[in-house]
């Protein structure tokens, strides 16, 4: 996004001790360890957190050739047990982390953000209105005096960016010099500037601060007026002056004085301004586009009372220092939700997330939003992220908000910008994938953003001008290679945990700044604990499902171990929560039974009919096969016994968990699939419906199948999954290719036409699922989407990539 910030904590807000720049402690104090070989699942009556204390931590072999060869066959003999200590109470550690995050989310106000020495220096330069010759805000000068770094500079102590250190330091030197205080600090700061100014030549241009080419020359001129001599003959400075002159020629002075633009954010660097006109463009809080330095400059020239109130409030709020932008409330609310979701821990915070998005929706406008509420200027980054999250959570938002950002065939983050931001276009791409039917603007946004990001990736130019983050190239690469239709929650989480930098991620504004409620180690450590806990349970389930497989000799019915693993992976990657184990195993076992039946009777219509007849003979009660002798050949008998024994177990599980007898519903669902399959021998016909119906039944969701919406969902899901199944079957022996997620299909190619139809149906399905006004339980509808996305993933994801995901998701612990 455009500007984001990082944080100073208020006294009544949660103390984020882990945000210490120099010595971050463990996020959850009191970790202790011991050896155990115990297996248990603990349940809490109010919030179920299942803690799988499994066998000692086990490691899998490194599958270095996983992308070139077939799926690694991971069996018990491949797994070496290691005596690795486990936390005494993982449940307590997770609960403690959840409580900390809940406290953070519950304390959100205008945004937590770090202090900017540059902006604080501008505030310190303001002369007292009633006592000329003295500072209006002496506490800002004191903040500067207290926060000089050991090398004589000011700026972020953990990240050395020459642009950041130089502009912060020069501004602070000017402020101290103006009021003739702390000459020793001035001298040390000036020495730092002179010794390091040449480093600008080697800096990455993508990481140049916002408006640096305007603000820094302005500071140099101020320094000269105060008698501060700085050599200006370096090639780096000459380049900056050239960029400044070019940018100033492009600034439409007539427009900027009459219409709110992003130039209001950098007024302190612009010459010859008509302040009488500009004051009319103030934000409602008295600021100029929420910039303390820009507003401080305006206060110097206008003595405006609203400017004074804005600055005065910030100085008191942050104890003398001020941020580089404030407030950042919408940015913080949106990005927090995004991080929690991608880290896989959002399920712990449903009420808080609902509150966050409700807040964002209250300030949503027909033109979008920016980083703060009540802004007359919007940006594509915050608008895209907000649009995506609001639509995902059932809010009605129009894609027309993106029209103002379209410029010809391109989309821009702001009108008048000089270069694109990777993350802005990346978030536009993510938003465009929430497309409903006939949303042309999103089609255009998707096509542009995909092409832009692919070109940047091919040129190894995935550096962003708004954030320095741990692994943006792989984050963007994953989104391009695995579009949202194919993106499985656990796969995204497993990879994002490695890409998320926690408190080390730093944002780029006029200075570097941090957003501790967006980027922190509390989220990261909680995500790691929760992921490994879930994975431990998944590993136990994997062991057990292999025993189920062996017990029924499913290998003899055409289901190999690799298929079993892929099927369990698909179920787990969608339904990963410990408390949803029954649904997860039901998904996996149902899919495996379907495969076994379809594979074994693939070439014999007579045997399919025989199987269907025998299936229907069983009474519609519990205990289908108890004591009954099957007068059919052994294979059919074995499969029928297997199916009904498994259905019996499903029914018992549902009865125990939900207190409902779903036996009849299960039988009806299976009978419908069996009869459909026996006609044409195509297992894909109706398979998705069987999975959806069974999963929802096991989750305690019952719904009238006669309802029009329910029938429409089933029809769409069956249609799309059947098409995807056939597409996968037809292309499984060809060289796989990633899905072209840009809408640019070749209409003369039958496969492209099939893809176009799939995309069209997917948009309609997404619209039905995300529409919250139809009265249907969202959890029921989400099952339709989850099953369909698993088919999409299978059809369009390279087998080598699938193998890699399986190894990461199920067998590689997060460290």
Curated annotation (Swiss-Prot):
Its EC number is 5.5.1.28. It is found in: Plastid, Chloroplast. Inhibited by high concentrations of magnesium. InterPro entries: Isoprenoid_synthase_dom_sf, Terpene_synth_N, Terpene_synth_N_sf, Terpene_synthase-like, Terpene_synthase_metal-bd, Terpenoid_cyclase/PrenylTrfase. Pfam families: Terpene_synth, Terpene_synth_C. Its cofactor is Mg(2+). One of its GO terms (biological process) is gibberellin biosynthetic process. Substrate binds at residues 247, 465. Gene3D superfamilies: 1.50.10.160, Farnesyl Diphosphate Synthase, Terpene synthase, N-terminal domain. Its main location: plastid. GO terms for cellular component: chloroplast. The Asp-Xaa-Asp-Asp (DXDD) motif is important for the catalytic activity through binding to Mg(2+). This is (-)-kolavenyl diphosphate synthase TPS14, chloroplastic. It comes from Tripterygium wilfordii (Thunder God vine). The lineage of its organism: Eukaryota, Viridiplantae, Streptophyta, Embryophyta, Tracheophyta. The gene is TPS14.
């Amino acid at each position: 996004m455009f500007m984001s910030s990082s944080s100073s904590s208020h006294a009544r807000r949660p103390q984020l001790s882990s945000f210490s720049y120099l010595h971050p402690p463990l996020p959850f104090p009191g970790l202790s360890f011991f050896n155990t070989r115990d297996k248990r699942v603990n349940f809490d009556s109010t919030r179920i957190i299942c803690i799988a204390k499994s066998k000692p931590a086990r490691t899998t072999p490194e599958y270095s050739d996983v992308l070139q060869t077939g799926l690694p066959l991971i069996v018990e003999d491949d797994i070496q047990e290691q005596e690795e200590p486990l936390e005494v109470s993982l449940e307590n550690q997770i609960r403690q982390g959840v409580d900390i995050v809940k406290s953070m989310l519950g304390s959100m106000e205008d945004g937590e953000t770090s202090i900017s020495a540059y902006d604080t220096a501008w505030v310190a330069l303001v002369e007292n209105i009633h006592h000329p010759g003295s500072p209006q805000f002496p506490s800002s000068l004191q903040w500067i005096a207290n926060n000089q770094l050991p090398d004589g500079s000011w700026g972020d102590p953990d990240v050395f960016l020459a642009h950041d250190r130089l502009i912060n330091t020069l501004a602070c030197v000017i402020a101290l010099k103006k009021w003739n205080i702390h000459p020793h600090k001035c001298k040390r700061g000036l020495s730092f500037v002179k010794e390091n100014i040449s480093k600008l030549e080697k800096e990455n241009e993508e990481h140049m601060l916002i408006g640096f080419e305007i603000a820094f020359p302005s500071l140099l001129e101020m320094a000269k007026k105060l008698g501060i001599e700085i050599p200006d003959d370096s090639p780096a400075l000459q380049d900056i002056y050239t960029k400044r002159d070019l940018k100033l020629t492009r600034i439409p002075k007539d427009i900027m004085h009459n219409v709110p633009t992003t130039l209001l954010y950098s007024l302190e660097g612009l010459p010859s301004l008509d302040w009488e006109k500009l004051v009319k463009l103030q934000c409602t809080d008295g600021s100029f586009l929420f910039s303390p330095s820009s507003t401080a400059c305006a206060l110097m020239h206008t003595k405006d009372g609203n400017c004074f109130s804005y600055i005065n409030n910030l100085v008191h709020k942050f104890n003398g220092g001020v941020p580089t932008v404030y407030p950042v409330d919408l940015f913080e609310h949106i990005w927090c939700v995004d991080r929690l979701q991608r880290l896989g821990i959002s399920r712990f915070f449903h009420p808080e997330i609902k509150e966050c998005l409700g807040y964002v929706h209250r300030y949503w406008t027909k033109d979008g939003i920016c980083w703060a509420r009540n802004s007359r200027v919007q940006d594509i980054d915050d608008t895209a992220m907000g649009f995506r999250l609001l639509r995902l959570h059932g809010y009605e938002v129009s894609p027309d908000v993106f029209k103002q950002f379209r410029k010809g065939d391109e989309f821009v983050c702001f009108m008048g910008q000089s270069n694109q931001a990777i993350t802005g276009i990346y978030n536009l791409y993510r938003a465009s994938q929430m497309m409903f039917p006939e949303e042309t603007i999103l089609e255009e946004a998707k096509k542009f953003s995909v092409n832009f990001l692919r070109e940047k990736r091919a040129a190894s130019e995935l550096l962003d001008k708004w954030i320095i983050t741990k692994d943006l190239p792989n984050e963007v690469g994953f989104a391009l290679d695995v579009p949202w239709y194919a993106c499985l929650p656990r796969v995204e989480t497993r990879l994002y945990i490695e890409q998320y930098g926690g408190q080390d991620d730093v944002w780029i504004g006029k200075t570097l700044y941090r957003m501790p409620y967006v980027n922190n180690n509390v989220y990261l450590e909680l995500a790691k604990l929760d992921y490994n806990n879930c994975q431990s349970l998944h590993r136990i389930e994997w062991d057990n499902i292999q025993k189920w497989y062996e017990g029924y000799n499913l290998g003899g019915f055409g289901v190999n171990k690799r298929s079993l693993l892929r099927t369990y992976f698909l179920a787990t990657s969608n339904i990963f929560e410990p408390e949803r184990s029954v649904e997860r195993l039901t998904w996996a076992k149902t899919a495996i039974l379907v495969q076994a039946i379809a594979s074994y009777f693939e070439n014999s219509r007579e045997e399919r009919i025989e199987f269907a007849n025998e299936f229907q003979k069983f009474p519609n009660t519990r205990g289908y096969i108890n004591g009954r002798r099957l007068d059919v050949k052994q294979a059919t008998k074995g499969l029928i016994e297997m199916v009904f024994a498994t259905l019996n177990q499903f029914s018992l599980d549902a009865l125990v968990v939900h207190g409902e007898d779903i036996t009849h519903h299960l039988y009806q669902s299976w009978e419908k699939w069996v009869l459909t399959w026996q006609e044409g021998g195509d297992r894909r016909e109706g398979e998705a419906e069987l999975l959806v119906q069974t999963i929802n039944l096991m989750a305690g969701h019952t719904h009238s199948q006669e309802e029009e919406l329910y029938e429409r969902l089933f029809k769409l899901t069956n249609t799309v999954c059947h098409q995807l199944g056939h597409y996968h079957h037809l292309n499984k022996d060809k060289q796989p290719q990633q899905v072209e997620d840009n809408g640019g299909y070749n209409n003369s190619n039958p496969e492209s036409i099939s893809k176009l139809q799939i995309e069209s149906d997917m948009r309609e399905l997404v619209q039905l699922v995300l529409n919250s006004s139809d009265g249907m339980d969202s959890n029921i509808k989400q099952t339709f989407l989850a099953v369909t996305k698993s088919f999409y993933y299978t059809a369009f994801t390279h087998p080598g990539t699938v193998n890699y995901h399986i190894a990461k998701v199920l067998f590689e612990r997060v460290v």
